[in-house]
Each structure stands twice: as structure tokens, then as C-alpha cells.
Amino acid sequence: MAEIKKTWHWSIFSFVLFVAGIFLGLANRNVLQIATMESLATTSNKWFLYQKLWFILPITLVLFSVYFGFVGFPRIQRQGFRYPITIIASILFLFSIVILYTDLWGYQKFFSDFWARSLIVWGIGWLCVWALHFYNMKQNVFHIAVYVFIAFGILFLIVGQIPRISNSPFTLAWSEGSFIYMASAIFDKRIYGVDLPLPYIMSTRHLLESIPFLFNDIPIWFHRLWLVILSLGSAGLLGIIITKKIPDLSRINRISLCLWVVLFVYQGAVYYNILLSVVLLIWGYEKNNFRKSFVFMILASIFGGMNRINWAFTPPILFFIVWIIDHPEVVVGVKAQGLYLFKLALWGLLGAIMGIGALFLYYIGLGGYTFATFIERMSATSVWYRLLPSSTFSLGVLAATIVTVIFCWIILFTKYSRFIQLPGFQKFLLLSMNLLLFLGSIMVSVKIGGGADLHNMDAFLISTLFTFLFSLDWDKVQNLSFKSSSILILPMFILMLVPVGWRIYAIGPVHIRTVARDQNELDILKSTIKKITDECSSPPLFIWQRQLITFGHIDNVEVIGDYELVDLIEMAMAENRPYLRQFANDIENLKFSLVVLDPVPENFGRGKSFSEENSLWYNDVVSVVAENYLEKIVLPQTGTTIFFNYCP
């Protein structure tokens, strides 16, 4: 019998047991709440089986881990346990995918809670760690654990994209169809035979999304696949380029870090067109070539500025962060420090001016919009309470941001980072730049229309990522292991897990919409349009679902350039009264034979998700339409609402 010793293995198992216990307690509470709401009888066979599985499965996983810790890995390997444990891990992994992403046995609702999903991933993840460890006893267990959980996160990310690749003619999300339509507007004459306004929201996004429209008769599912490729590809490209800038990484660690970067940027749902600005910046950056780096900073500012005005300023700041870390000069004296700051400000201002110039060239020069309209869009109301937990964002912007970046900043102030070795003046500059981007991101996040996730915190998330990755002492980090006595092993491990946690949070059943599933509603919409337009001489107005016209599902319909969904909500949030009065006049004069709208918002008072936006939308758009078009048909599956009048 092998001697029982409390080695470093035991410390790992204690940690696994402790975390599993927390997940189990929190998950079980949620399960009991669901069971109570569902009025499930505790004597029913399904509920009885579920209760047993719920307690037996995680406890079994924990007992396995504890047993392995006591017995010792060499003995297990000799006994031939590595093959059974690999089989068990594989079976449970497949079982978890079925439970998390389908409703095959009717139990998926019990795993809709974050803690229940986390418990499954935690238990099966550690089984996979031990299974891999048995095949190579010399491999660093800490590294294996990091690889396994990052792989889980990437898997969840990819599976989560599957429902987006649908051939359904209807929009898959509130604004998805609008962005497809806006991309098509770049080829307006060829597709619609009329001149349409250039899309203005995020110009480079529309330009990139329009690429499939270069070819005729490309189905909508391919356009959606292209969006997924752009999203995953931009994040992957950023990961590849950043890791190439970090020397002396082993191949497996370089791949893992690249994938972790992908997960990190997806925490904030950083849009791919923003990421491509960052990719451009870091691709051209060279530590010993300022001129080349500066040119690419200018290009990144131009690209970023064409998306959002704050991203005209962000690339120069990101460039300075990396440059300061790579060039830790000692700047002594007020005069020298003032000159140093002046040079940074001058270079940054040049980049920002180029970015803003590109924005206005597109917005005013090509798009034909006015500067006054731009100012109106910038002066929208702020909803500060969304910084805190609310119905729009359960975590709140502040708490979610802290969870996302806190461990990066903790590690930056340890011996594993070169940050603490920088001269005081440069440390002050780095902290100031990150603080500036944090405050700027907060200002953008609280603007009405935002605050539902962290996508408007993108500048601060990227600055934290740059500061963290380029400051780390990678020789020390690569030697971290559970055998070491360093207290930093825990925050480093949690840091690797946090992006995976966001992927677990986003898990939901995979439902793929199809043409066949939506055909009935499409037929109703087409027949209604034909009937009303035959009776009335005026054209229909598609505020929502314009992509139906784009791909020919609704034919013989004139496209109205004005009053598109995203444009209209932007004007409502900016309280652009002249624009909204013109809309109201056109509706009151029955300029259109019918109006196709999104689902009419109900119960949108304070305490409801996006209450301010829904209130403005209802008052400025829906109520105006409903008061003048007295008949209404609601397509129940998609929520598409058709307002019309019978013509005499």
C-alpha cells in the first residue's frame, strides 16, 4: 500500500473541492427555486432522478480527485487507470455538451444558471487535466489546467457562434438585419436601383460586411458566416500578432496565450472593426523602429476614427503604453519631464487629428450628413445608474469591468511584472493613460443605448491587456507551477479562468432558425403587403426587416432610404426633433401604404431592461404609427408587426 502523503497534489485537490462545494451550493439553490416555480412533485420519477444525479455527479468527481491525491499518480498509472479515466472524462464531456446546449431530456432549464454550468465545467475540466497528466507525468499540472480550461472556453465560444449561421430570412437579433441592409446600401444602385444614404454608424464595419455583396446571389447564411469569420478572425489575428511580439514563449504557451487573448477581448464583446484598428497598430509596431511604428499608429487612428470618435484618440495612447514599457528611460527634472510629455502629446494629437479628419471626411464629405447632426448624436442622454447592477445589465458596468481586469492589475504590482521596475515618472504615465481610457470608456458606456455589456469599455480593456502582456516577465511566468510556494499562483490561475467564466455565462441552447421554420410568417407578410399595396398607391415602409428586400424574399417593393430602424432609434435617443417631426408628418399624411415594425415594447417602465430606450421608441415611433395606421398584424414567432389601413 502506497504511503499517504499530503503533497502539493493534495493542495490542488483541496482547492478543487472547495470551489466545487461553492458551485454546488449556489447551483443547488437555483435548482430548488426552479423546481418550486415549476411546481415539480418531489415524488415524480424525473425529479427524483434529477436530484440523485445532481448530488451524485459532482460528489463523485470530487471523490475521484481526492482519491487520486491520496493514492499517487505513479501507482494509478501502473494500475492502468489512465485509460478508464480518459474514457470517463470523454463520456462526461459529451454528456455536458448535450446538457448545456440542447433540451434533449428536458433538463436544460436546470442548467441555465451560471453556477450549475460552472460546476459541470469545473468537474469535467479537472478530470481532463488528470487524464492528460497521466499520459505525461513530467508535464506541469498548472500548465495542463490552463490549457484545458482555455480549450473549454474556445469550444464554448465557437459553439455559441453556430446559431448565427442561419438561412432564416428574418433578422436573428434586433439590429442584425439592419446592419446587413446597411452593408448592402454601399451597392445601392446594383441591388435596389436607387440612391441610398451611406451608412454612418461604423463605416469600416459596413465596408467590411459589404464584401460578400461584391458577388451576386450570395445567400444570407453566407453573409452571416462572413460576420462570424470577421469576429473570430479579428480576435484570432490580434492574438497571433501580440504573441509574436512576446519573445521566448514556448510553442504550446504561445498558442495558449493567443487563444486566451481571443477569450479576453470577447469578454467585452469588442467589435471586430475596433479590433482591426488594434491589429493594425500592433502589427506595425517595432521596438527599435519608431518611424514605422508611428506610421502604423496614424493608420490605426484613421481606421479607428472612422468607427467611433474616441477611437481616433485611443491608438496613440495604446502605442505610448507599449513604447514606454519597451523604453524605460529615466527622465529626471521638471523640464525634461515636460519635454517628454510635450512630445507624447504632439505625436498623439497628430494621430487623433488624422482619425477625426477621416471620420468627418466620410461622415460629412461622402455621407452628406451635417456637423449639427453629428453633435446631436454626441449629445444623447446619459444613464448613470447602469454603472451599477440593473435590469439592463445584471452585473453593472463597473462590477463587470472590475471582475474582468482586477487580476491583471494585481499581478502587475508583483515580481512577475516589469511594471514595478519602471521609473516612477513612467509608471505614473502608464497609470494615467489607463485611467484616462477608463474614464472615457465609462462616459461612452453610460450614454443611452449602451450599458448592457462591456463593449463600450473596449478602449480600457485593450489598454489593460497591452499593459499586462507587455509588462510581464515571461521567463518567470512560464515557470509557474502548483509545486511552487508562490501565493501568486492563485490570482494567475483565476486570471486565466475569468474569460472562460464569461463564455460559461453566455452558454445557451443552440436553436438554428431555418427558412422552413419561418416560411409561414414570410407567406403572411408577403400576402399582406401584396394585398395592401395593390389597394393603395403608396409604397410600404420597412423600418424593420429590410434584409427581406435585400435578398429578394419581398419583391416588387421600393426601398425607402429614410427611417431605417437603427437610424430612427439613434435620432430618438438624440431627441432630434426636426427629424422626428418629419417622420411624424409623413406618417400622419399616410405617405406609406403600411409600416413594418419590430415587436411593440410593453411594460418598459423603470426597472425594465432598456427602459429609457424603449420609452423613447414607443413615444416617438410606435405610438405615432399606431395612431395613424389602425389595423395591425403581429407575426408571433418573429414579433414582426405590420401596421396598415384598408384603402377605399
Kindly label every feature range from the protein language model.
Residues 1-6, 66-79, 131-138, 243-249, ...:
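Membrane-interface junctions at the ends of membrane-embedded or membrane-associated helices
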Residues 114-121, 449-488:
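Hydrophobic/aromatic-rich transmembrane helices and adjacent perimembrane loops
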Residues 200, 527-573, 584-604, 635-642:
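Short periplasmic/luminal acceptor-recognition loop of GT-C membrane glycosyltransferases, typified by
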Residues 1-21, 51-160:
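Start-transfer (signal-anchor) and selected internal transmembrane alpha helices
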Residues 267, 471, 484-518:
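Transmembrane alpha-helical segments
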Residues 13-62, 98, 102-107, 156-210, ...:
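Transmembrane catalytic cores of multi-pass membrane glycosyltransferases
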Residues 225-258:
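Transmembrane-helix motifs of polytopic, lipid-linked glycan transferases
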Residues 597-648:
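Aromatic/acidic, Gly/Pro-rich catalytic loop(s) in extracytoplasmic/lumenal soluble domains
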